[in-house]
């Protein structure tokens, strides 16, 4: 399912069972719009089950475990400072894992989905949390975007 609004093109691929919760396409557009504003971008968001996520994590990150989200930058992705940019990368979100995590953390599912989408998108833009300075900068940006969207600080 492709969503194209103004300058953003979002390809959402859902390979999960029908009875599993994941946000409607309008939410992904809203979240990404708050990051990219009027930039021309294309992004793929793939909603997967635990089996596929574990496979992808092992194959590409060399970790034999589950995770909530993976980000894969486009080979020619650059930090967005220019007015236009095309394909920036792929985000893989594990629906059962995120939903379970929301229950454990006593957070609203939609809010955790927003945070995971924002967090992984920032990775596509070269944000990281490898050291304390970059982690602080990334978290500050995540908190700012989440609050702008009317959500709570995801780190509280």
Curated annotation (Swiss-Prot):
Question: Which HAMAP family does the protein's record reference?
Answer: Endoribonucl_YbeY (MF_00009)
Please share the entry's free-text remark on the cofactor: Binds 1 zinc ion.
What's the family? Belongs to the endoribonuclease YbeY family.
Tagged with keyword Zinc = yes
EC number(s) given by UniProt: 3.1.-.-
Q: Do you know which SUPFAM superfamilies this protein is assigned to? A: Metalloproteases ('zincins'), catalytic domain
What the entry lists under InterPro entries is as follows: MetalPrtase_cat_dom_sf_prd (IPR023091), YbeY (IPR002036)
Question: Which Gene Ontology CC terms are recorded?
Answer: cytoplasm
Role description: Single strand-specific metallo-endoribonuclease involved in late-stage 70S ribosome quality control and in maturation of the 3' terminus of the 16S rRNA.
Name the cofactor(s).
Zn(2+)
Compartments where located: Cytoplasm
Report the record's Gene Ontology biological process terms.
Answer: rRNA processing
Q: Which domain of life, per UniProt?
A: Bacteria
Any Pfam family hit: YbeY
> What's the name of the protein?
Endoribonuclease YbeY
Q: Which UniProt keywords apply?
A: Cytoplasm, Endonuclease, Hydrolase, Metal-binding, Nuclease, Ribosome biogenesis, rRNA processing, Zinc
rRNA-binding recorded as keyword: no
- Which organism is this entry from? Buchnera aphidicola subsp. Cinara cedri (strain Cc)
Per UniProt, what is one GO molecular function of this protein? zinc ion binding
Query: Which residues are Zn(2+)-binding?
Result: 119, 123, 129
């Amino acid at each position: 399912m492709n969503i194209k609004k103004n300058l953003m093109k979002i390809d959402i691929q859902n390979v999960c069972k029908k009875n599993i919760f994941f946000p409607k396409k309008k939410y992904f557009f809203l979240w990404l719009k708050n990051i990219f504003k009027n930039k021309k971008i294309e992004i793929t968001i793939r909603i997967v089950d635990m089996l596929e996520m574990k496979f992808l994590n092992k194959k590409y990150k060399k970790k034999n475990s589950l995770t909530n989200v993976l980000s894969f930058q486009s080979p020619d992705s650059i930090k967005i400072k220019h007015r236009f940019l095309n394909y920036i990368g792929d985000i893989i979100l594990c629906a059962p894992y995120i939903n379970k995590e929301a229950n454990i953390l006593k957070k609203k599912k939609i809010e955790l989905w927003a945070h995971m989408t924002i967090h992984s998108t920032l990775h596509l833009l070269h944000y990281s949390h490898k050291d304390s300075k970059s982690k602080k900068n990334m978290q500050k940006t995540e908190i700012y975007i989440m609050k702008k969207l009317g959500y709570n600080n995801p780190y509280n």
